[in-house]
């Protein structure tokens, strides 16, 4: 089952290195790029380039380059017409060998804001106009779990990985491009690094195709966490999602003061201690469809039929959150 993301949310899962792909719709102020991965045990360096074009030797508007070389540091620079500019350096290393990380680039009007594992790390002033950037390049001593472009527009023409995960590229036999009226939708503004417990209002209630995106980190000592789709006025819970670390992913509903029958069967549990996750929950006509890290996790048939009354999202437990969009 192919994962089809909502417009404005462009993920690629488990991409191979070197990663060299277009940025959907091009880079613009207000966009964010999320990179989740793991630094290799023998890591010496890696880089992320915001490039002006796809060719080798293309200008690089922003070069981000962590280096483990005895003087652990991160180097920042810009390349124009084959010449590197003046380096900026920060003698601090936010990455740990053998550890998972989340690296976020937020495109601000005056600079790129770099956030690592939820902590602000650096601001790099624009030397080239943001609108010139067309491609993202990543390579080096790391493993990639996912790359997400948030807030941009879909590319005018499809390319492999643009609207589906790599296992279902747009050019695959039997692939039918989704129609706009069948695409999932996100209606609320994104919230960055919200505190846990989190409570968010689902303005207008749940509707068919509405998709909720939750990106977070499972704490190393985690036991479980909870996501509830709730009716604020009655306390009914249309979907209670309870990942239990090292066990299973429990689903249930709470109606008229009573819990229903638990559902526990999943092919795999994607929530491990010390790992990042990317969760997509889509409301359908007769069920919720849930994807984790781009892979179908489970369906949950509606027990609470008046799902349009669901107006509250609750998240609590042994996690931190980096991004929620409802």
From Swiss-Prot:
Cystine pairs: none
Keyword rRNA processing in annotation: no
Matches recorded under Gene3D superfamilies: 2.60.120.200
Keywords, comma-separated and alphabetical: Lectin, Repeat
Function, as annotated: Galectin that binds lactose and a related range of sugars.
Subunit structure: Monomer.
Protein name per Swiss-Prot or TrEMBL: Galectin-4
Organism: Mus musculus (Mouse)
